[in-house]
């Protein structure tokens, strides 16, 4: 018998979610950030490429007035895995007040800024 190809539907984003993308030619890093609103805060799901293996990174939400709110941190895997789940984060930033999401090293080097 012949197996039929399986078709999987793209996951549906929750209402009000936005997908933001950016690339930084200086660092070679590109990122895709899904922003999901909650009441008075946001959830972030980040897929980034071009960051050195083993790099310690932090995720920061930036408000329209320039306030910086920590949203998470992680260590980049030693071996890139395109099937790895996105890095998750959250920040107490009103969904409509988000201006950008920044990925930087813990030492402070900005790798990419994704504008909202």
Model-assigned labels for residue ranges:
Residues 1-3:
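N-terminal, charged amphipathic alpha-helical interaction modules
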Residues 5-116:
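Folded interaction domains in cell-surface recognition and envelope-stress signaling
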